[in-house]
């Protein structure tokens, strides 16, 4: 599989603060990668480093085959790191025409990209008349003018209303379906779950998980249990290796499964050991629960 970006032991310090710590992961062609983490986890710093706008402290990264200089590699990259920033008194077409001149791209690309982001009918409207969602879509059109191999987006739906969020997510999926690799930073769990094929989870600059999204959420699930004797039930669950993390809140026990097991089998196991349940529900563990487990201090 063709490699787009390789990051090895990347570290960035701002004085005494370590924003990114010994981070390594690889991005392969054709996938949608999400860097997921709470605010301050190092997502934007990581993107800034690979785009050469933030200097790394140590470690390294390589674009494409590893023999391409960062300067040349970035010609194949489209990126939106800050909020969309165009001349407000110029039309969408005029703004993109200016970008084409800077990037050395033919003007014929403008209508093609405006149509892709569903703004062709507003090509002659001034940027200052656009909604925030439209501004973000215009920024994506701008980033795609040079037909990049990878599109990098930092919090692409931040500040948008539900309709704008849906439009941007649908656009990301459309762009990915056409073969463009995408790397996005987000603190929104459902965003990563809906649009990404792979996820890198960060907390305080450290990688907690890296891999396919579907593998992360294909765990064995968890059980919600209640019994009249909560302490006895807790002691039994803790003695069995098929149960991982166990927590109790207001008499409701949540037990995460380390092995496949259905509710019927659990009920029988407990009954055979003299424990009668008053409540038993098996649930599928969502990306949110996985994320909260990983980032739990």
Say what each PLM segment does.
Residues 2-5, 12-184, 189-203, 209:
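ABC transporter nucleotide-binding domains
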Residues 11, 296-297:
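C-terminal end-of-chain micro-motif
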Residues 74, 96, 111, 166, ...:
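Generic structural signal for individual residues within well-ordered alpha-helical segments
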Residues 92, 213, 284-288:
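Structural motif detector for alpha-helix initiation sites
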Residues 169-254:
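ABC transporter nucleotide-binding domain
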Residues 200, 293-296:
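Short low-complexity, flexible loop/linker segments enriched in glycine and/or proline
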Residues 222-294:
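Short, charged/small-residue-rich alpha-helical element at the C-terminal edge
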